[in-house]
């Protein structure tokens, strides 16, 4: 089982996404456990303040170090043995490779930043890892935590009903996912590719691989550059590039 401990000043934000669909089923099966911790519960003033003005001046408020430290000590989050992740725009960009690495742990702690930022001592003294879900600004780390929990949970054995589902998701193979179709085979003149109706699984597998290479090359060529392509992949990709060149030259 993989346990997530999420520290947030707004834990109620997680009620809906964690109480339905795949994540709810995974929790019901005992495959993952999600514990929410309200950072305000670890404050000592009557207003339960988790933020304060920055030393030296400047706009905005910063998350205070004391309540975060107390929360981590209360839940026994030992940064020497488990990932204690600060969700921040300054962190390592989250991707499938990071998700796969995190899924191998039995416990992950997520600290959701908020306000203008966090006291630097949270970053340096309490967290042992920083992760960002992209180069854009969000109100807080809660949305980032939802993304991370969902992505990592899918990789926990037993969470997905079909063992092949995770393996064929976009990015799991380093490529974007190939096109997929379901019934009916024709609708308003829009037909499913004949190869998928042929029943020839070898041909279908080759078509899917070629389409995945094509989609990745057209939309995310940077992913192709990172891959170690097999001879068959190179052959299929050459066919894709040749066809695309002919179309563009017409």
Curated annotation (Swiss-Prot):
GO terms for molecular function: tRNA (guanine(37)-N1)-methyltransferase activity. The keyword tRNA processing applies. Its EC number is 2.1.1.228. One of its GO terms (biological process) is tRNA N1-guanine methylation. Its main location: cytoplasm. It catalyses: guanosine(37) in tRNA + S-adenosyl-L-methionine = N(1)-methylguanosine(37) in tRNA + S-adenosyl-L-homocysteine + H(+). Belongs to the RNA methyltransferase TrmD family. This is tRNA (guanine-N(1)-)-methyltransferase. It comes from Syntrophus aciditrophicus (strain SB). The lineage of its organism: Bacteria, Pseudomonadati, Thermodesulfobacteriota, Syntrophia, Syntrophales.
């Amino acid at each position: 089982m993989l346990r997530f401990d999420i520290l947030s000043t707004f834990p109620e934000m997680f009620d809906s996404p964690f109480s339905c669909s795949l994540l709810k089923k995974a929790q019901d099966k005992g495959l993952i456990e999600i514990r929410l911790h309200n950072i305000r519960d670890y404050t000592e003033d009557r207003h339960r303040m988790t933020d304060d003005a920055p030393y030296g001046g400047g706009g905005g408020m910063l998350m205070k170090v004391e309540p975060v430290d107390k929360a981590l000590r209360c839940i026994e989050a030992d940064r020497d043995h488990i990932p204690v992740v600060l969700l921040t725009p300054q962190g390592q960009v989250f991707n499938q490779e990071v998700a796969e690495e995190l899924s191998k742990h039995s416990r992950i702690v997520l600290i959701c930043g908020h306000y203008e930022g966090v006291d630097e001592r949270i970053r340096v003294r309490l967290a042992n890892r920083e992760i960002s879900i992209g180069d854009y600004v969000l109100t807080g780390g809660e949305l980032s935590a939802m993304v991370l929990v969902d992505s990592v949970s899918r990789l926990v054995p037993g969470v997905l009903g079909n063992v092949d589902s995770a393996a064929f998701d976009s990015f799991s193979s380093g490529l974007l996912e190939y096109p997929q179709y379901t019934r009916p085979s024709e609708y308003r003149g829009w037909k499913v590719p004949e190869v998928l109706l042929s029943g020839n699984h070898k041909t279908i597998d080759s078509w899917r691989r070629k389409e995945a290479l094509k989609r990745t090359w057209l939309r995310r060529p940077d992913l192709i550059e990172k891959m170690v392509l097999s001879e068959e992949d190179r052959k299929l990709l050459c066919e894709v590039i040749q066809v695309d060149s002919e179309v563009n030259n017409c």
